[in-house]
Amino acid sequence: MGEIGGEELVLDVDETIFVAVAEDVERSKTTVLWAARNFSGKKICLLYVHRTARAASWTHKKLVGGSFKKHDVKVIERVEKPKVDELMNSYLQLLSETEIQTDKLCIAGQNIEECIVELIARHKIKWLVMGAASDKHYSWKMTDLKSKKAIFVCKKAPDSCHIWFLCKGYLIFTRASNDDSNNRQTMPPLVQLDSDNETRKSEKLESSYMRRRLRYWRSLLEQDGEKDTGQLEREKVEPRAPPLFSSGSSSSFGEPVGPEPVSPELVDSDTLNTSNVEEKEREGDVARKVHRYDKAMHDIGQSDRTVYGEAGKKWEEDASTTEALCKAKALEGLCIKESSQRKRLEELLEKEKLEVKMVIEQNNGFMKELQMVQGRNLKLESQMRKLQDLEKEHGEKFDTAMELLKSFRQKRDEIRIDHENAVKEVNALRRLVKGETGESSGSEMLDYSFMEINEATNEFDPSWKLGEGKYGSVYKGNLQHLQVAVKMLPSYGSLNHFEFERRVEILSRVRHPNLVTLMGACPESRSLIYQYIPNGSLEDCFSSENNVPALSWESRIRIASEICSALLFLHSNIPCIIHGNLKPSKILLDSNLVTKINDYGISQLIPIDGLDKSDPHVDPHYFVSREMTLESDIYAFGIILLQLLTRRPVSGILRDVKCALENDNISAVLDNSAGDWPVARGKKLANVAIRCCKKNPMNRPDLAVVLRFIDRMKAPEVPSSETSSYANQNVPRRPPSHYLCPIFQEVMKDPLIAADGFTYEAEAIREWLANGHDTSPMTNLKMEDCNLIPNHALHLAIQDWQNQW
């Protein structure tokens, strides 16, 4: 065992509490803090045994005058001492906040417990605090020592040392010293007992006497060692007690001594080879003196144990008494605590009893309610069985009624067919009897059954669907060997059967070349049957996504004229018909690019509300008045006319055209794909469109005036000097194509609409029918009837056109 330091440490063991610490700070942290709390008036010295691999090779016998070369000692110190200093600084930092005087005693050795025992004996340590076991072994029942080191120190340490053994910061065991009764004055507060003054004086005298004897023998040994500074270490050294050295008194290791032989690795081979007989004799003298010193120290220890033996027994008795009193107080405290807990548990028990009583009462109430619910459940089950029987009975009746309904429908369809055939026969007989040739004032509309509609649309095959919107879905169909378009109206806001048939009858009488012909209806399914137009809509021509050839500017002006003519015809009808939802998708084009307006009069069959405010085709005044008027159709026509001129997105078209007109640069917005627009005509048409889109409906022009103006735009261009007004009476011009009779190719004087939807001169179509023709002069298809309807709107338009010239 060797001390880390070169000089011997002088300690005041009466005022110092020694605390044995481990290499791991966390393991000894609670022990150090416990000592700091309980011995605040004492000085604390940290006792640390540094276990190193070379400790076994160090000798436990002090070599006089430098047994190692100074170079070897410094080499060992440089390797081990920094580690020890770093560890001690960690412990001192832990105690720095307690304001307790601290010191450290560090030694190097192989066996930690033996080194601690030797330190106690060498320094006469009176008060020692050390661990009883690792923290993981702690329990509140723990009263015995678990650590082998603690057990060894408890058994082998001198009886003069009072030792406290702790675990996890709790005092586990106390080993009293045999001289506690003689050291009551210097005892720390934790173990101090009453003692008389004689005992304290005796303790001080004995302690000072032992210290003087120890210093005397050490001085003799050092004097002899100074004379033999050249002495070498022998191969075998006699065992002796290890010297103790202060950790901070020197910058080098102290001379290592101990019961184990010195390792040959630490002995300079050159020094051993130069040894001689004289040096061995002097070394023998020194060894004999050391042996005498050790024997004297042993005698001193024996005398100490004899002197303090009786005092130790008395102190043990006093300690036992004190411990018994402490246990009694602890038991008294436990009894009081147990009594309070018992009282609290009794209160909790009473509370639980009340709660159990309440739960039992609630349970009884629930049981009564359960019995009532079960009784009601039985009644409900019986009622449910009765309802199930009624449901079964009604189901059978319903099935029977459905079969009857199916048979009635079949009979109705048969009767309807018979009725239609009978009506045709009656009409034919009347014409034969009265000599009529188709001058009937009206036409009969055909009603179709739902079964016929279902069969015509292939049971509403999704692949046959042409489109779907807010106001119904449109399917393609084959009805009586003709291609038709079936529009299924929505069910909400539907009229009653009679009113629906009446209004459809009115729409069926409306015939115009630029209107899609309404061929029939199915009141049962609220569906309308129109003629099928296969060439798409005007919206397809405006869209850049479809590969549709662009319309020429001549075709666009003609289409605008046809739209205006059809609207004027609807507005002139009796009763007046408002389209209400005019937009490019509602304007169809046939194979000859002839305009066919669809969905006219839908607002009379279903309520049109909730129109989208973002739709530019909707009249802004509608959102104020919530009413569709003739001016609403004029506004929509103005927007469509602007689209025909520019083919621009409808969202900002009105603003763009106004800006171009203000800057006198209408050619910047005209659609170049239509060809070379006549700039003057384009500007005039744009002005007409802007007038149609006036915010105030009262400022919008009449459609008859607009139609006359657009028709004039279809004529060859005239010089600007001659176009100061709507017409120049002296300039010859060609009449619009729809003013000409398809048969005579002359301007019609009395236009009549035939069953094929075309308008003819009255004389021409009557002569055609009188010659026995039952097919259309235009399509060569068989006409449904020979009824003719006057086209008043077209007649008025022709008269206005003729009046201009």
Swiss-Prot record:
Protein name in UniProt: U-box domain-containing protein 32
Protein task: Functions as an E3 ubiquitin ligase.
Family matches, as Pfam families: PK_Tyr_Ser-Thr, U-box
Species of origin: Arabidopsis thaliana
Transmembrane regions: none
Skewed-composition ranges (Low complexity): 245-257
Top-level enzyme category: transferase
InterPro entries: Kinase-like_dom_sf (IPR011009), Prot_kinase_dom (IPR000719), Protein_kinase_ATP_BS (IPR017441), Rossmann-like_a/b/a_fold (IPR014729), Ser-Thr/Tyr_kinase_cat_dom (IPR001245), U-box_ubiquitin_ligases (IPR051348), Ubox_domain (IPR003613), Znf_RING/FYVE/PHD (IPR013083)
Keyword Ribosomal protein on entry: no
Gene name as annotated: PUB32
Lineage of source species: Eukaryota, Viridiplantae, Streptophyta, Embryophyta, Tracheophyta
Keyword Transmembrane helix: no
GO biological process: protein ubiquitination
Disordered: annotated span: 181-205, 226-284
EC number: 2.3.2.27
